[in-house]
Amino acid sequence: MRTVDLRSDTLTRPTPAMREAMMTAEVGDDVFGEDPTINKLQDKIAEMTGKEAALFVTSGTQGNQVSLNAQTRPGQEVICDKNCHIFNYECGSAAMLAGVQLNALDGKNGLLNKTMIEAAIRPEDDHYPQTGLICLENTHNRGGGNIYPLDEMRCIYEFAQSQQLPVHLDGARLWNATVATGISLKEYCQYTDSVSLCFSKGLGAPVGSIVAGDKAFIQQAHLYRKAYGGGIRQGGILAAAALHAIEHQLPKLAEDHRRAKAFAEALHQMSGIHVPPETVETNIVIFEVDPKKIDAADLVRQLQVNGVLMFQFGPTRIRAVMHLHITDEDVAFALPVFRKILA
């Protein structure tokens, strides 16, 4: 039976051309800073983001956590959104590893603004934790792949500078934002002190993320990466996959966005499904299921039986994610399955 797997863009697999690039990659010992392919990737990302330096890490979680460690002190507080990845999906690492607590605000579909952040800054009082860092996520996973307006990022960053607070951007899917808007990585990252980017989601690399910032930040991030077991030796085979992805896979994200919009428009016409198509900005579609029509968990189960895999995202919410291995034919296969179940 045909299977259309829309659970996540982390399901992407290396293409034959990417595997060839990995197989022929020049490698060295990266712990000694001698892997030429990793160095090439780090230099490329530093240039693309407009930062002084970059550091290859094994995962987005590792990238975010070394960024928190490098820019905070134990006992401080980090401002973030209550639906962000750092708060929900990193195993409490901010407390476990950095010794900081998260002040998770109720953003609008995951997005914060200057007013929210300004109100969350702690007074200078011995009773309160000191605010140490602001974290944003762009695009926002639980927000449905929505994009931070560049002007809002600017307002937040300018306020943060006035408070002498660094801003970290979880940009795991920032690639999607750049493709959707035409705004470059450098333009987005000018309003951050540090940024993490992921290669193993829509870009299709098997492993790896990267953080970028000034040289002092990268020096500290390097220390924490090593402390967390992230020092790798001949990692150029992984960096080669990332370099191939940037060159060959990045433009294809536009097709994921087009399919997500078309998918949302079709779902919008179905009884029992609520998803305003205009809210779909990139490759993620999160839709509400009317519990009077069908239970969300039951819908996910019935879809799976019929060869369509999705992820339940709450009592009444389901997420579908378009990615490198999803075709127009896959979308055309999935939609009649919905109609049959909802009939």
Label every PLM stretch briefly.
Residues 1-278, 282-306, 310-326, 333-342:
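Conserved PLP-enzyme active-site core in the AAT-like
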